[in-house]
Amino acid sequence: MPSQRPRSRRSDNPAIRAEPRGIGTARARDPLAREVKLLGALLGQVIVEQAGLAALELVERVRKSTIAIRRHGPGSAAGRSQRERLTAELDAIGLPEAEVLIRAFSLYFQLTNLAEEKQRIRALRQRLRTGARGAVDESVVAAVLGMRRRGVRGEEADRLMRGLSIAPVLTAHPTEARRRTTLVALRRVYRLLDRLDDPRLTPAEDAHARRRLREEITLLWHTSPIRVVAPGPLDEVRSAMAIFDETLFVVTPRLYRALEQARLQSAGGEPTREGAVPPRTHAYLHWGSWIGGDRDGNPNVTAATTRQALHIQADHVLRAYEAVCRRLMETFSVRAPEDGALAERLAADAAELPHTARELDRRFPGEPFRRRLGYIAERIRRTRLRLTSAEAPPAEAIVGGYPTPFALSAALDELAEQMSTAGLDRAVYGELQSLRWQLETFGFHGLSLEVRQHSEVHSAALAGRDPTGDTLETFRAIAEIQRRFGEAALHRYVISFTRSAADAVAVLELARRAAGSAVPALDVVPLFESADALESCGQIVEELLTEPSYRAHLERRGRRQEVMLGYSDSTKESGALAAAWMLYRAQEQLIEVCRRHGVELALFHGRGGALGRGGGPMTRAILAQAPGSVDGRLKLTEQGEVIADRYANPAIALRHLEQLTYAVLQASTPAHEEQLRAAAAGGRQVLDELAKNARSAYRALVWENPGFEEHFRRATPISELSGMGIGSRPAARSGRAQAPELDALRAIPWVFAWSQSRANLPGWYGTGSALAEYRRRHRGSGLRRLRELYRSWPFFASALDNAELVLARADMAIAERYASLAGETGRPIWESIQTEYERTVEQILDLTGRKRLLDDMPVLQRSIELRNPYVDSLSEMQVLLLGRVRRMPDDDPQRRELLRLVHLTVSGVAAGLQSTG
């Protein structure tokens, strides 16, 4: 299946690709190309074995046809003729052949995505090997060096470092199209590819790795990529904790150590001293989660769910601590005198844990630190039994555990002091320090769970309309969780669709009613997401900060107010450019209001993974925030559809976290903030005008055109997406489950549907009209002014660069195929979309001075060009299947099977585009 043929032995049949010769990939001139060729060849072998040679020949014909269409040009006579032949062939095949075709291209993308992931890591390691680490862009070393270049040194640098706080919050999105089973299988394939990178590989080992790859690809061929049953909230919790086990727990101390080493080098210290002296870097990551706590529009999340979510998290984190202690117990094999405080501690441990004492005394006589770690591990085990038991804990768990994380921290501090006295500073500030950092970060709860609920639910509960009683029970659950796991386990309550100060006060009143004297410690977080709410958020927070009961509550909480800004719904309502400017102005309002009232503002950015929901390159987005909005702190959602991409691989996770650290530190320097203020002062009127016109153009199509909703329903697979069972949350907050009304439809499926149709409309529509109108009104000076702003203002550059990315990933020729499903009645709407696309591309190219989209990002540009023909194959199949299934009566016996194939194409297109919603 690969697009480039290797120079190697061939089969007599040209459809069967030969495997690359040689051993492994370590010495290949182009290891990525070699891996893609190998995976394509192995997949071809599996297709022949499992479906026959005719199936592979069909796949090859379709692949060559889509490539030919691209080569000729979709609008050319040759391209149209080629497409007609392809459509006729696809329309004639039976359902079994269609499934083989869909599976072949889908699995090809899953495999090549792994190869590209490996190449990212390979390239990063190469940069680290060939130059000073500070030369790597957006690393923590670059962050520290950048601060020095910007004049942030000495006490000012230390102050910024002490206040550094980054809080990624994991969410369970219904747009992670891949099953957990598939993700785990792909990790196995990745490890086998990694094995082939070993330069010491022998021919026998190479053959073994290839055999195992064939085996895994065969298993993937027979594994359904879509779920038969939608996952429940606790399934999503367990998936998140698998990421915790494999990546977050391991990578977190590595990040701290990387920053510690960078600070030491920057201060002129000897690099070898890192790990031998007390670290200055604190645990600045504050991991959060909405998984099991977000009940906005999700009736499957209840108070019981939230309780169970914390139990699952605690079980994972305490098992992780215990495993580390048992591992260190095996390595800290030091003979040392047992006297003083150490002897007293060992005697106390033995008296309280006599069974453990007998085993440790037998195994480790004269090795006090191994025995000490053995006791700590046993106490952690008992702590886990006590905290995670649904019923009464076992008798052994009642005594001997740690009552709080602080008690375990004190035990580790005591051990560190005793080991340091024995001359073991390297061990104290090495592996033991990593455990102390992990404990400081994760406590006994793992991820800090947050509750989110719609403001209308609170109003109804206050009025006595809480039919299940779950609203009040949620507050009781929060109080219980805090008693059991500590306040850090759950203390934030997010109010979606906040419209007034009363919405925040209502949460405190409900907590008082539910818990009585045991009111939980809560930080109330208003979420502003609609255009009206973003415009008035400053006034709402002003009223909130002057409301007597709430102000008293805020004083008790340390005069710190967190506010969340929603990127997804604001973009769906107003379009990408207008929403970006609304969010920027909202930040400015909130900064000013909180400054006036002497309250510390903490902003929480509810960014989606997709560009149409506020996603995009994160470093650029952080550097483009309003001046004063970062100040060493960042809190943002890590949406479900990108969690696996960012965190499944520890090396990529570490790189991502280094980039976040870099961006936060750079954005917090006075020089950067001054640059932002100067640029914003000159560009505010321009953005006011652009945003107004962009919003007007977007809303004229999406919200004011009476035929648009029907066109959207026909020209995208939105109705079919709603039945896929991707996540535990319904696609809409209210209304029809299978075909929700547009205003009730969540932003996620909204963007997902447009991504599947290849139009990507939410990320760019309206931008071209706004730019063109500005240039028309301001004539010769308009383009010059826009170019000046693009060069000088990170916010404006980020907004346009994001639009360019979305446009480059869109494909109007394929989108027109989807639009044809809407019939002639939808033609005017499609023509509006196509015209605006062409206008937006033209305006952005004029403004940036580029000849083609992404000319400044040639690697990504080439990747999209290479992938598009393969994605086209799946898109063509999806269009045909959608047409068939929609023409069928609901009771047709074939309808269910056709829908299953549609869902398979959705999964495949998402893999090919590396994007969902």
Indicate where each model-derived feature is located.
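Often metal-dependent polyanion-binding catalytic scaffolds in large enzymes
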Residues: 2-470, 522, 615, 702-705, ...
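Hydrophobic cores of alpha-helical transmembrane segments in multi-pass integral membrane proteins
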Residues: 44, 587-597, 838-844, 848
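Conserved alpha/beta core surface patches that mediate binding of polyanionic ligands
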Residues: 263-287, 504-509, 539-550, 616-628
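Catalytic or ion-translocation cores adjacent to nucleophile or general acid/base/metal-coordination motifs
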Residues: 301-332, 514-696
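Active-site cores of enzymes that catalyze phosphoryl transfer or operate on phosphate-rich substrates
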Residues: 371-375, 379-392, 423-424, 429-505, ...
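Flexible, glycine/charged-enriched surface loops at secondary-structure junctions
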Residues: 601, 671-682, 704-712, 849-857
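Active-site phosphate/pyrophosphate-binding segments
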Residues: 683-694, 698-732
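C-terminal accessory/interaction regions of large nucleic acid-associated machines
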Residues: 712-720, 725-917
